[in-house]
Amino acid sequence: MAHIPQIKVPATYLRGGTSKGVFFRLQDLPEAARQPGAARDALLMRVIGSPDPYGKQIDGMGGATSSTSKTVIVAKSSRPDHDVDYLFGQVSIDKAFVDWSGNCGNLSAAVGPFAIAGGLVDPARVPKDGTAIVRIWQANIGKTIIAHVPITNGEVQETGDFELDGVTFPAAEVQLEFMDPAAEEEGAGGSMFPTGNLVDDLDVPGVGTLKATMINAGIPTIFVEADAIGYTGTELQDAINGDAKALAMFETIRAHGALRMGLIKSLDEIATRQHTPKVAFVAKPVDYVASSGKPVAAGDVDLLVRALSMGKLHHAMMGTAAVAIGTAAAIPGTLVNLAAGGGERQAVRFGHPSGTLRVGAQATQEGGEWVVTKAIMSRSARVLMEGWVRVPGDAF
């Protein structure tokens, strides 16, 4: 039996926010994987180590969590007023598919630094010292992200004193602006609130009728009230991720919310759409202790939010869900806004399992409709390893 040798693919392993993933320049991918399709998906799954029935991704670069089973492809952009196109693939851990239905807000922070270092940004746009403005086209959802990347001596500055709850070590701050984050793309309901309401009654079999804010901003997200499903909003991962009944409940909420939002046509479609929508629960502030042991006082935050990603409670907060939180908080009457105390607000600081995060959004009413021009938050990013990733030559 002939054994196919491994091939080497240029790649960079980066942390972005509270996630990490394998980044590729489109031009560096094997020719068969330069276009969307089965070959690309198979390559990325093999790189990450999926599908893995053991759920560990031992034979790949993945870390067996939703935050670490991620891939990114970046290319020079042909679009006016954009520097690069950014495509994100969320790799299923134990099933054979890559979910292309949404963005990763955390890894968005690493796209600008990767693009600059990889020669994908016009050198004339990169100062010797200061801040480079990288204009990113987020190809999954058809939106613009503006990244403010610190530059020292002509190179991306990665070290610094910016601290991010959920990340152990400080690093340089990368500010992100998510422009016009509400949905307009086909299949997303065509608006920020696909049902037309700030709050809906969502009928969930086995759970009952829940008040829900279903919003598409940053990423489609279903917000429910913590106390309506038996929680306080102070839960850490262990309280939910080991509870099969709770996880099944959240997946049922997610499926029925997706149907109401027009993201799926039948409930059975949700099984292969793990990345979107997200489901989250909100509560008014109370004291709690974060997963690091750090106390979070009720007075330190405007509200509490817990969110699930890929079927598990997230260890911190997905960046795109933070955009949804900031956007919903800015619009009076949503469940997120009410949990934060109601009224008009341009920014909120919310408590999550790892600590706190501040996110802002600019919202205005036009013709009776709420419009959000942008959401803003800060993350950090750092190269962890660069070189080549190896995969068997017959893997795709």
What are these regions (language model features)?
Residues 1-396:
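A glycine-rich beta-to-alpha transition motif near the start of alpha/beta enzyme domains, typified by
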